[in-house]
């Protein structure tokens, strides 16, 4: 582990195939593999690390994404090996030495954490997370069963929070850091996201892995592909026509993001993107969980005496609140930070340091509210580590960053939220700015 060096890339070679396609190579722990004909079980994310012709060093990404997999190394060993002497650095000797030092330090630190048990799941923590969600849903429906308008409103709000908490625990399961058993975490992810949020856990995992592979990297991080509903960076709106309906929408996106855009994004996911993916990939069990969600909701609302129309309205309100809860918390960790060019290759540590921020890590309330993902830097460094352990390792991560002159941001929650909305406003008003400068 850690034998590879971030930044090294494979020399470009032509395949022996008659069609003349470029060979796709990938470098892991100093070994160069031919991945041209390899169908990655985890989807197209592997293309980020082969980049068509020149494979980049994927050691850190490979180990973090496959830490709990018993099959990954078997797949890797089955790939044809190429002459590693053709591997050359795209950086100067000084820059490559800096990156190699980070790689060695990071690998040694990670091995320490594994040996000390920081990657081990906790059964009491698992029980707490599940019981909390069940209790929140039960309380929400109990409140909605009361005749008081105040109880009804509180019940809808509580239900939205419960759906958001389902999103948090699904996120943990999707990373394989809940039970630590990949197949079990995957099935639980599908159940909690399907019943709790009405969405596909498998689709989410497919997309979210791309975000982790290259956060805030244009044409790689799917979290930047948010048009037409919202835009988080000026570079993604350069092709928006000034004066168009989209341009007008973006000018007010800072005001619409929470009350309108979050709901529209959620509805787009649950009614179109996720079902389309589930149909294409034949994720039949996920349809079962989502149908169970709808049947359960409307049956229960009917039993409580609510009309179909009122039941739909209450569903949309609670669903929308859940979307606001989740989407806003994810937005504050990345969206206001700089982006990198498609061709840029950052070190694994640099992605976490420069394109991620921690938020109020000393606050127990924020830690609960964000379900330990206010330690976003640690999460991006170690995506398969149980998230409740990040608080314990954060001082050591900060020390690691200090040794390599990397920033370690920890913003107050209120500052992170205000910065996020200020960025939405700035990006929305940047449409056409390049044209005006040219004039």
Curated annotation (Swiss-Prot):
It comes from the Eukaryota. A motif (Histidine box-1) lies at residues 171-175. A motif (Histidine box-3) lies at residues 376-380. It holds the Pfam family FA_desaturase. One of its GO terms (biological process) is long-chain fatty acid biosynthetic process. Belongs to the fatty acid desaturase type 1 family. Its main location: membrane. GO terms for cellular component: membrane. It is a multi-pass membrane protein. PANTHER family: DELTA(5) FATTY ACID DESATURASE FAT-4, FATTY ACID DESATURASE 2. This is Acyl-lipid (8-3)-desaturase. GO terms for molecular function: acyl-lipid (8-3)-desaturase activity; metal ion binding; oxidoreductase activity, acting on paired donors, with oxidation of a pair of donors resulting in the reduction of molecular oxygen to two molecules of water. The chain crosses the membrane at residues 123-143, 254-274, 287-307, 312-332. A motif (Histidine box-2) lies at residues 208-213. Heme binds at residues 40, 66. Residues 7-88 form the Cytochrome b5 heme-binding domain. Keywords: Electron transport, Fatty acid biosynthesis, Fatty acid metabolism, Heme, Iron, Lipid biosynthesis, Lipid metabolism, Membrane, Metal-binding, Oxidoreductase, Transmembrane, Transmembrane helix, Transport. Its EC number is 1.14.19.30. It is found in: Membrane. InterPro entries: Cyt_B5-like_heme/steroid-bd, Cyt_B5-like_heme/steroid_sf, FA_desaturase_dom, Fatty_acid_desaturase. The cytochrome b5 heme-binding domain acts as the direct electron donor to the active site of the desaturase, and does not require an external cytochrome.
